[in-house]
Regions:
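Thiol-/selenol-based redox modules, centered on thioredoxin-like
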Residues: 135-172
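Sec-dependent N-terminal signal peptides
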Residues: 3-13
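Loop/turn elements at helix/coil->beta-strand transitions in domains of secreted/extracellular proteins
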Residues: 50-54, 82-85, 115, 136-137, ...
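Solvent-exposed loop/turn segments at secondary-structure junctions
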Residues: 61-65, 92-96, 123-126, 148, ...
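Structural microenvironment flanking redox-active thiols in thiol-disulfide oxidoreductases
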Residues: 52-54, 62-109
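A short beta-strand-turn-helix
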Residues: 30-53
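Short, internal strand/loop/helix patches
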Residues: 87-89, 104-135
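N-proximal helix/coil linker or "cap" segments that precede and/or mark the start of modular domains
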Residues: 15-30
């Protein structure tokens, strides 16, 4: 019984140890090779979340349209590209859709939003490392130092979209 309790406590601590909270820099994650990476095959690292304000859309392909109003609102803001970067990370392990179909759709999105960095996560790396909601659409914003300044798991309301825009403006 004592061993079981120790095991359960260890599992709980390991599961919560990497959750990112507001005002914190998330633990480093790197998506490369079998774990994922950019559309062009190059690796992506969370170390890149510095120097500019970044917004990450971490999305299950089945929820791809959930936060379109937020991405469209950000696009309309025309934030300067030397101070702002959007990143779309696709949780490919969260869907039954074949990767080739998703990759085709991502290439179309890349053409529509050329300033956005598109990244594939084949193994739910961010779900595990940052405790992001799985099978969902998540929006996270980071300041120039890589500190989390906004987080929403699920659909953003109109008020939350305005809050996101305000937080970005305040940190540019």
């Amino acid at each position: 019984m004592k061993c079981l309790l120790i095991l359960l406590v260890s599992l709980f601590l390991s599961q919560t140890a990497y959750s990112i909270d507001m005002g914190q820099v998330p633990p480093k994650v790197e998506l490369k090779e079998k774990l994922g990476g950019r559309l062009d095959g190059k690796p992506w690292s969370s170390d890149e979340l510095q120097g500019k304000v970044h917004v990450i859309f971490y999305v299950d392909p089945d929820e791809k349209d959930t936060n379109n109003p937020a991405s469209e609102a950000l696009d309309k803001e025309k934030f300067p590209s030397d101070k702002f970067q959007s990143v779309a990370i696709i949780n490919l392990a969260a869907t039954w859709l074949p990767n080739f179909a998703i990759n085709s759709a991502l290439k179309e999105k890349q053409e529509r939003y050329p300033k956005t960095i598109y990244v594939r996560d084949y193994k739910k790396v961010l779900v595990q490392a940052w405790k992001i909601a799985d099978d969902s659409s998540n929006v996270l914003a980071f300041d120039k130092k890589g500190i989390l300044i906004f987080r929403k798991d699920g659909k953003l309301s109109a008020e939350e979209i305005q809050k996101l825009i305000k937080v970005i403006r305040e940190n540019l």
